[in-house]
Amino acid sequence: MQVGEYRFAAVGNMALIDSPLHAVHVRRRFTPEERRRYMNNCVVAARRGRVLISPFISEYEKQVRDVVLQEGFPVIQLTNECLSQFYKPSGELFHACSQGQLLLLSPNDSPVPFSTRITREQCNQLNMIAEAIAGEE
């Protein structure tokens, strides 16, 4: 799947990429109050029709993703995992995918074996890609 200058392996609802997007990236420097406000704003953005896009790496980003999915809104998740043609997400992400609420994207040029822990550099790169796709560079 080609999105702008980026090429991805994709699993899930590919139509989500054509929706208005909102990147989610909870910064470490946020105070607890800033973090709470930012997370609330992300959920409100989803309620207003924007599809959240992020690697959803931090526990706070995962909380935002989980709330949005529980409310029935879609998300696009970037991952460093290799998405083969037989890949399927597990748990709640499997359910979200089966309901058309999820699109998983993996940059084709950087698949990482499942047993490899994601690095800070990879996290930063995935966040930058999410922000670029959402037009929030």
Predicted regions, residues:
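Glycine-biased, small-residue-rich flexible motifs in mid-sequence functional cores and linkers
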Residues: 1-137
